[in-house]
Amino acid sequence: MEIVYVYVKKRSEFGKQCNFSDRQAELNIDIMPNPELAEQFVERNPVDTGIQCSISMSEHEANSERFEMETRGVNHVEGGWPKDVNPLELEQTIRFRKKVEKDENYVNAIMQLGSIMEHCIKQNNAIDIYEEYFNDEEAMEVMEEDPSAKTINVFRDPQEIKRAATHLSWHPDGNRKLAVAYSCLDFQRAPVGMSSDSYIWDLENPNKPELALKPSSPLVTLEFNPKDSHVLLGGCYNGQIACWDTRKGSLVAELSTIESSHRDPVYGTIWLQSKTGTECFSASTDGQVMWWDIRKMSEPTEVVILDITKKEQLENALGAISLEFESTLPTKFMVGTEQGIVISCNRKAKTSAEKIVCTFPGHHGPIYALQRNPFYPKNFLTVGDWTARIWSEDSRESSIMWTKYHMAYLTDAAWSPVRPTVFFTTRMDGTLDIWDFMFEQCDPTLSLKVCDEALFCLRVQDNGCLIACGSQLGTTTLLEVSPGLSTLQRNEKNVASSMFERETRREKILEARHREMRLKEKGKAEGRDEEQTDEELAVDLEALVSKAEEEFFDIIFAELKKKEADAIKLTPVPQQPSPEEDQVVEEGEEAAGEEGDEEVEEDLA
C-alpha cells in the first residue's frame, strides 16, 4: 500500500522572484602586497602531512553449491577367506589351501574345468600379442621427473591449548582415516587445563575430527587393530594401556589397572598377529616390556625386564622409547632405549635372561625410531641424536650405513613400504628428508620444510604415496610424494640386496681387523711384562733406605718449622721505646761493639 502526503504552501511565502541579467566584470576591492609581511615569511621544515596508505579492499559475495557426501557400505559374502583364517598369515593360508586341495569336490571341479582352460591357454599361446614389429625404431626417451612432494591436507588440534602430535596410525581398510595421539611430553610442564583427548580424522574432512577418544591420561601412542579396524590400542602418559571400540563411542572400552601397568609413559604399543586378534605388547621407559590380552586387562600375560646384564633387576633396566615387531618373525622383537642401545629379544626363550639375545650400541642419545626393512628384515633403520643409521643383524659392533650429522636433532624415521632403498626422516627444525640411497648416499634426495615448529612423528601409507607428519603444536600435515618416490624402480631389489651385502661384508672385515689389532696390543702388553728381568724386579734396598731417610727428615723439618711458628705467635710483642731510650741503647751498642773489636784484636795477637 502506497502512502502519499501532499505539502501545501502559498505563493506569497516563496519570496520575490529573482531577475538576472548580463553585465561587465567589476573590481570591488584591490589589496596591494605588503613587503614587510613577505620578509617575515618562513618555510616550514619538516612539514607534517597526513596520508592514507592502507590497502583498498572491497567486499564480494559468492554463493557456491555444497558438495554433499555420504558413506555407503557393501557386504561381499561370496568368495574370499573364511573368518577363522587370517589372509596376512602365511602359515594359515598354506594350511587352508592344502585342506581345500584334498577335497574331492575341488579335485572333480578342477578336472572338469581343466580341459576348457587348456583350450583357452592354447589359443593365447598361438599368437604372440607382445611381438615387436619395429625393432629398428629408436625407443622413446622416458622423461624422469624430479622428486617432489605437495601438501594435500592439514589437520590442526581443535583444542585452544595446543599439544604435540606424538603418534600416528593409518586405518587398515583403505587408509581413509588417520588416528592421531596428542600429548605433552615435557615432564611436569603440562599447562593447566590441557585436554587429554585424541582424535580420529577423516582425510576428506580436515575441519572436524570424526571421533574423539577420551582417555584417563593423555595418549603417547595409538594403533589401529589390523584385524578389526573398529578397535584401537593406546598407551597413556601415566603408564596404563587403554583400548577403544569406535562402535561403542568415545569412552574407553578396556583399561589396565594402575598396579599392573607401566610406571612411566608408554612409548610403544604393537598388535600381534594372532588368531583372536586381541594380543598386543607395550614398552615404556620404566624398562619393561609387557604382553597383554585386551579381553583381560587386569594384568599382563608376560613381562620382560630390559636388563642387559641379564640379572633381571629393574633398577638396572634400560628405558624403552621405541618398539619394533615384524609379523614374518613372530618370535623376535627389538627395543630402542634411551641410552642409545638397540636390544634384540626372543620372546620364546626359556628363561628371562635368555630373552635378551644381543645389543647394538651406536647412538649418542635416545633412539626415537626403529623399523625393519619391509623387503630385507635382517636390516633395520634407527634414528637417534643427529643421524639415521642402517644396521644388519650380522654386524653387531657398528652400523653398515649412516647419514651425515645434521644441525637439528632427528625425531622419527620410517621405511618406504614399496621401495627398499627409500626412507623418510623428520627433524626438530620442521624439515622432512626423503633419502634414496640407490641414487645418492651423502645427501637426501628431497628436503621439504613442512612447518616452522619441530616435527615429532611420521607415518607412511601402505602404498607409499601419502606421508603424515605430526608437529609440536599438534598440526598433522598430509603430503603426497611424486610417483618416482612411490614406484618400484627397475632392478631396485637386486641393487638394494647387493648394497646391503657389500656393506655388511665390509663391516665384518673391519671388525675382524679391529679384533686383530686389539689382540696384538694385548699380546704386546703381556710380552712387555714377561720381558722384565729379575734385576728390574729386585728391590734396591739402598734406594729405598735413602728415600725413607729423606722422607723422615722432611717430616722432622716440617714439624720444627711448625713449632717455631707457633712459638712466635705466643711471644708477647715488646713496647716501642722512647727517643731517649733509643739513644741510650745506641750508645750501649756502640760501646759493646768497641769492646768486641778489642777482644777480637787480642785474639788475633
UniProtKB/Swiss-Prot annotation:
One of its GO terms (biological process) is determination of left/right symmetry. The lineage of its organism: Eukaryota, Metazoa, Chordata, Craniata, Vertebrata. One of its GO terms (molecular function) is dynein heavy chain binding. Belongs to the dynein intermediate chain family. This is Dynein axonemal intermediate chain 2. InterPro entries: Dynein_IC, WD40/YVTN_repeat-like_dom_sf, WD40_repeat_dom_sf, WD40_rpt. Highly expressed in trachea and testis. Expressed in respiratory ciliated cells (at protein level). It is found in: Cytoplasm, Cytoskeleton, Cilium axoneme; Dynein axonemal particle. It is linked to Ciliary dyskinesia, primary, 9: A disorder characterized by abnormalities of motile cilia. Respiratory infections leading to chronic inflammation and bronchiectasis are recurrent, due to defects in the respiratory cilia; reduced fertility is often observed in male patients due to abnormalities of sperm tails. Half of the patients exhibit randomization of left-right body asymmetry and situs inversus, due to dysfunction of monocilia at the embryonic node. Primary ciliary dyskinesia associated with situs inversus is referred to as Kartagener syndrome. WD repeats lie at residues 150-203, 208-246, 253-294, 301-347, 355-393, 399-437, 443-481. It comes from the Eukaryota. Keywords: Cell projection, Ciliopathy, Cilium, Cilium biogenesis/degradation, Cytoplasm, Cytoskeleton, Dynein, Kartagener syndrome, Microtubule, Motor protein, Primary ciliary dyskinesia, Repeat, WD repeat. Residues 579-605 have a biased composition (Acidic residues). Gene3D superfamilies: YVTN repeat-like/Quinoprotein amine dehydrogenase. Residues 568-605 are annotated as: Disordered. Part of the dynein complex of respiratory cilia. GO terms for cellular component: axonemal dynein complex; axoneme; dynein axonemal particle; external side of plasma membrane; glial cell projection; microtubule; outer dynein arm; sperm flagellum. Consists of at least two heavy chains and a number of intermediate and light chains. Interacts with DNAAF2. Interacts with DNAAF6/PIH1D3. Interacts with HEATR2; probably involved in outer arm dynein assembly. Interacts with CFAP53. Pfam families: WD40.
